[in-house]
């Protein structure tokens, strides 16, 4: 089996929910592979989005590019529907004035069908997520 970016639209991955949406910066931008696009929050926190893999995957490493995110919680589930999430990772990110935050998370027990990313707090009224990549393997397709 080959390792791939499981969060790529070419792998069939989708953002199926986001708590805020700006028509110029929609949540799909997180996984479109374009470094010029991003999703932005619309103020109030927490904000969240859910990524659906449409298959069972094993994530070995996550790389998140964001701006002004203070605390990020990531939850996962192996359910066929986006239910029964369990907390997986919670990180306080470092504020990087004028540049993107690059957070690399080496995953343990990274089995999932959905990931929920919760921006618990931010360094400003708005925050953005520019990209998420997940290095790993497809375990099986969903029945």
UniProtKB/Swiss-Prot annotation:
Example of a GO MF term: metal ion binding
Question: Cellular location of this protein?
Answer: Cell projection, Cilium
Which Gene3D superfamilies does the entry mention?
A: Galactose-binding domain-like (2.60.120.260)
Q: Where does Ca(2+) bind?
A: 29, 32, 37
Q: Per its UniProt record, what InterPro entries does this chain match? A: FA58C, Galactose-bd-like_sf, IFT25
**Which tissues does it occur in?**
Expressed predominantly in the testis (at protein level).
GO cellular component term of the entry, any: cilium
- Summarize what gene deletion causes: Null mutants retain the ability to ciliate and survive through gestation. They die shortly after birth due to different phenotypes reminiscent of Shh signaling defects: polydactyly, cleft palate, lung isomerisms, and structural heart defects. Conditional knockout in male germ cells results in infertility, abnormal sperm morphology, significantly reduced sperm count and sperm mobility and disruption of sperm lipid rafts.
Keyword set, alphabetical order? Calcium, Cell projection, Cilium, Differentiation, Metal-binding, Protein transport, Spermatogenesis, Stress response, Transport
Q: Which GO annotations describe the biological process of this protein?
A: cell differentiation; cilium assembly; heart development; intraciliary anterograde transport; intraciliary transport; kidney development; left/right axis specification; lung development
> Would you identify the family this protein belongs to, as annotated?
Belongs to the IFT25 family.
Job description of the protein: Component of the IFT complex B required for sonic hedgehog/SHH signaling. May mediate transport of SHH components: required for the export of SMO and PTCH1 receptors out of the cilium and the accumulation of GLI2 at the ciliary tip in response to activation of the SHH pathway, suggesting it is involved in the dynamic transport of SHH signaling molecules within the cilium. Not required for ciliary assembly. Its role in intraflagellar transport is mainly seen in tissues rich in ciliated cells such as kidney and testis. Essential for male fertility, spermiogenesis and sperm flagella formation.
Its quaternary organisation is: Component of the IFT complex B, at least composed of IFT20, IFT22, IFT25, IFT27, IFT46, IFT52, TRAF3IP1/IFT54, IFT57, IFT74, IFT80, IFT81, and IFT88. Interacts with IFT27. Interacts with IFT88.
Please state what the protein is called: Intraflagellar transport protein 25 homolog
- Primary gene name: Ift25
């Amino acid at each position: 089996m080959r390792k791939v970016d499981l969060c790529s639209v070419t792998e069939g991955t989708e953002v199926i929910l986001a708590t805020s949406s700006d028509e110029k910066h929609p949540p799909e931008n997180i996984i479109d592979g374009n470094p010029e696009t991003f999703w932005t929050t619309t103020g109030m926190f927490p904000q969240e989005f859910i990524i659906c893999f449409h298959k069972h995957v094993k994530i070995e490493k996550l790389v998140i590019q964001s701006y002004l995110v203070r605390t990020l919680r990531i939850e996962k589930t192996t359910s066929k529907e986006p239910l029964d999430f369990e907390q997986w990772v919670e990180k306080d990110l470092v504020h990087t004035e004028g540049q993107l935050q690059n957070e690399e998370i080496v995953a343990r027990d990274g089995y999932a069908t959905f990931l929920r990313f919760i921006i618990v707090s931010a360094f400003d009224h708005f925050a953005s997520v520019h990209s998420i990549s997940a290095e790993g393997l497809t375990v099986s397709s969903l029945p």
